A protein has these predicted regions:
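Short beta-strand elements
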Residues: 160-167
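Short, hydrophobic beta-strand segments
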Residues: 138-142, 170-177
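C-terminal active-site/capping subdomain that shapes the small-molecule cofactor and substrate pocket
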Residues: 15, 167-170, 179
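Conserved interdomain hinge at the start of the Helicase C-terminal
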Residues: 148-160
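Helix N-cap motif at beta-to-alpha junctions
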Residues: 146-150, 174-179
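Inter-lobe coupling/hinge segments of SF2-like helicase ATPases
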Residues: 1-150
């Protein structure tokens, strides 16, 4: 069988073998990080919040964040890049680097962040959310779990409510006002 996704633990093993030095795994489950055991840390987004500085931050397959099925995916991806930039710039030494692996190197978000033009992104994103009636211009609720189907049935007949689904046992409810 072929590994389709490497995963953090397997990536740590591969990197240790390649570099012939210890690599520390950092995830939200990591208890204590011993910064004296290694100079290389590999992990999930949690690493951005658990490490104070870095010489290099690498995002492998950043498209998973940039193109995720969440209406806030670009905003969340941008936040990760900003956190990474803070890590490589926070030490009183030569600034480090943030490297992003993507199949979409010309995505507008990369250019705007590189130029430090967050205002343009915010303006475009605000117009997009207004057009699609996403928050804060509309309201969205994801209903799933035990009792979800009965709850959805109870919403039948309510005007100004759009119910999408079911999709894998979940419904998306959209409304232009909170009532």
């Amino acid at each position: 069988m072929k590994n389709l996704r490497l995963g953090v633990t397997r990536a740590v093993e591969e990197l240790q073998a390649l570099l012939n030095e210890p690599v520390i795994e950092v995830t939200k489950e990591s208890d204590v990080i011993d910064f004296h055991k290694s100079r290389i840390f590999l992990g999930t987004e949690a690493a951005l919040h658990r490490i104070d500085w870095a010489d290099l931050v690498l995002f492998a397959d950043f498209d998973q964040e940039l193109l995720a099925r969440r209406y806030r995916c670009e905003e969340q991806a941008m936040a990760q890049l900003i956190l990474a930039q803070r890590l490589v710039s926070s030490h009183k030494r030569v600034a480090g680097k943030v490297v992003v692996q993507s199949r979409q190197p010309n995505h507008p978000l990369f250019g705007l962040i590189a130029a430090g033009d967050i205002e343009t992104w915010a303006s475009v994103e605000s117009k997009r959310r207004q057009l699609l009636e996403y928050p804060p211009y509309g309201h969205i609720a994801l209903i799933s779990g035990e009792g979800a189907e009965e709850f959805i049935k109870g919403l039948n007949g309510i005007t100004n409510l759009q119910i999408l689904g079911p999709n894998e046992g979940a419904w998306l409810i959209r409304a232009s006002n909170p009532e």
